[in-house]
Structure formats: C-alpha cells, structure tokens
C-alpha cells in the first residue's frame, strides 16, 4: 500500500495515475482550497476525504510520496510575475509551506517529493526561488533533479510544458532520462464530432473571431491570437471560457467552436467517468459553459506524466535512456547537466 499526501491537490491527478496503474493507494490527506475542486475529487474517489483541509500538521503524517503543485500564477508569464519569495504573501509563495510541513515530519519524511510548476519557474527572474527550494530540500536530506516535460511525449495531443522536480530522500538523484514515453495520440481521439456538440460552444463574439489564426504554426508564439487546433492543442488553461489559449475547433469556413469541458478533461488524461462524476457535483447552469470544470482541467497536471513517474518510482519500469531529455541534478549544492 502506497501512502500519498497531496498538497494543492486539485482534482487528484497523481491519485488518478496510481489508480490507472492498479497500485493500492491510501491518501492520508489532501489539501485544496477550491471547494468545487474538492467536490470533484471526492466524487471521483468515493468521498474518502469528505472535507476541505487548509492546514496540515506534518508530524502526524507518514506518506511514502508527497506531491505538490503550488499555485503558478505568480510565476507565470500570463500572470503578473510577482514571484514566490518567502514572506511575500503571493499565492506562489505557498510553496514554502511544503518545506515547513516536511520539516515537521522528522523521521517520517516522505521517500519522494514531487513538485510541478510552470516553465517560467526557471526564468531569470524566478529561478532563485526554485534553486532555494532545492537547497532547502537538500538540507532535509534530499537529492534533487528536475526536467521540463511535455504532455505530448506522454500520449496527449496537448503542448503543455511543465517543470517536474523530484527529490529523493537519502538516495541518488532521480534520473528522468529513462522515463517511459508514449507516442502522441491523434487529437481526433479526444475531440467529439461537431454534430454531438451543443451550439452554445460556437464562437460568436466578433472580437474573438477576429483573433482566430489559421495560418501560423501552432508551435509559434500566439500573443493575442487564437490558434485553430490541427495536430494538437496548445496548453489548456483555467480561462478557457474567456481566452481559449488551447485553440478552437474549426467547424466550417468562418465557423469555430470552443473545446468542451469534457474534451479539456480528456486532454489532461482523465477518463469520461471521472468527468461525469465531477459534473454530477458541479452541474453548472443549463445551456452555459461550466467555468468550474474548465478551471479544474486547466489547473490540473497531465495524468500520464504521473503514470510514467510512478511506473519508475514504484514499479521500477523504465525505458532506454533518452539522450534528448535535458536533466539537471543537484549534487553537493551544484547544478550539473546529465
């Protein structure tokens, strides 16, 4: 039985991954401030933790793996980049609460700690917080490594790059180079037929229609533009209703629609059953887009990435070394490229 602690747990991506792998799991606690996300989590996992937790006393917990994806808004380019300095009281500075919790655990520190955050966490203005986080983890007995992982390398047709930092207690740095990757699936496997999608997903606002770009390469920067989905979507965000960064689906010449909430959940690796359980407790308004379920998808972490991490950490399953993956490991306080 693997015991996990989920901080900033959202809708439970790591727990979904463990479930999909058939690994017996006990969630000893789950911390999430969004009440609607808590509803979805408990609907998906049989109400094992039917309460919202906002504080954790570390010394009462004995997890094997601690997972945290602290708020990204103050790291993100899309936000105001306020940063995450300890004591700054920004949302992203909550990352230091994880350090405080582990400090309280004493001899019961988790064997593995996994932290996920946006690509901009390694930008020149933000990198000092990431480096200090790893330094604090090293003081607690952990070796650290991190890599930029893309959901497209794990089967999902979504361009979503995020840094994953894995800290190992009293062991060698985690090696990302032999993670099992999965070929990207066809985006049509995730998108419903237009005839099955309600008309209220059709883009009608002139201001939005004027921003749709069918020509540019989907890998290019789309500042102020909205891409048309071809081989894959761009990053699913929590603001799909207002600014569909992911792109829009072309119905016919000059006619487009938004991704549905269900499609966004699929593109993060969730099953249709997961989505419908969440919908049952967050039904939204009739004939309106469901902002809560869009937000939950946009704030989540791709389930297949956790599946690959857990296949290595727990099951010992690896692939041939991938020399194309850029990995950084902290050894004796120095960052080195592997």
Model-derived features with residue positions:
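Short glycine-/small-residue-rich Rossmann-like dinucleotide-binding loops
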Residues: 71
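A structural signal for well-ordered alpha-helical segments within the folded catalytic domains
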Residues: 12, 35, 96, 127-131, ...
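Short, glycine/charged-enriched secondary-structure capping and boundary segments
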Residues: 19-23, 43-46, 79-83, 127-130, ...
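SAM cofactor-binding core of SAM-dependent methyltransferases
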Residues: 2-57
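C-terminal target-recognition/interaction regions appended to catalytic cores
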Residues: 206-338
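N-terminal Rossmann-like NAD(P) cofactor-binding module of classical short-chain dehydrogenase/reductase
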Residues: 5, 65-67
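Class I S-adenosyl-L-methionine
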Residues: 58-65, 75-242, 255-257
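Short, well-ordered alpha-helices that flank and scaffold nucleotide-derived cofactor binding pockets
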Residues: 16-20, 43, 100-103, 135, ...
